[in-house]
């Protein structure tokens, strides 16, 4: 963390995501205080409870100053609303693929806006772009698992026949990505590629 801050200086916002891997509460405090010292923008899902305990994260917030981004692993409107009302986070993680689709995601975003809280959309995709374009209380579009040597998002493989993509090269010079404008989600899926990669199928009737 210190090496990254030294490399980029103050020209970039930095965040860290231990992915619920820190072994104890005190380890989470230690990393959180390092975030404080280095001016991190947020501190995400630190320790091994998988961000499931609102009371534990409320207590952790008392020990550090860096805003916490929690609730990637909690599903649904009611559970996430409880987490917010119990003081378990500073920023709420939401995801249209996991939180009741676009409708559930927008409900959570509006709820948080009403109580003065910001949200962060988890990962990327056409739904995420549409939601983000309609949410005022959010900051960043997440292209996860990319780096200069891995240019496409490992969570969002290239499965489109149009110019949509979630790779490093799809980010504009201004740091933004466009919102698809076609019918539905605005993208055209490459079903030949999707079917070629299929490993199993289940039909619900």
Give the positions of each predicted feature.
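Metal-dependent enolase-superfamily TIM-barrel catalytic cores that perform enediolate-based chemistry
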Residues: 1-58
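C-terminal extensions of enzymes
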Residues: 158-205
């Amino acid at each position: 963390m210190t090496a990254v801050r030294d490399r980029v200086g103050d020209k970039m916002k930095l965040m860290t995501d231990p992915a619920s891997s820190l072994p104890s509460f005190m380890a989470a405090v230690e990393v959180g205080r390092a975030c404080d010292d280095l001016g991190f923008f947020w501190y995400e899902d630190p320790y091994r409870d998988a961000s499931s305990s609102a009371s534990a994260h409320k207590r952790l917030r008392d020990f550090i100053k860096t805003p916490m981004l929690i609730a990637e692993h909690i599903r649904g409107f009611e559970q996430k609303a409880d987490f917010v009302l119990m003081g378990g986070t500073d920023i709420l993680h939401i995801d249209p693929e996991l939180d009741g689709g676009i409708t559930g995601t927008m409900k959570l975003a509006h709820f948080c806006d009403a109580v003065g809280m910001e949200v962060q959309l988890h990962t990327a995709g056409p739904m995420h772009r549409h939601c983000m374009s309609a949410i005022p209380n959010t900051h960043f579009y997440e292209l996860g698992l990319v780096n200069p040597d891995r240019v496409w998002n490992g969570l969002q493989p290239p499965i489109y026949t149009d110019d949509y993509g979630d790779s490093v090269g799809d980010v504009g010079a201004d740091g933004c990505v466009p919102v698809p404008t076609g019918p539905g989600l605005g993208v055209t899926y490459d079903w030949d590629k999707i079917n070629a990669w299929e490993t199993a199928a289940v039909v619900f009737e």
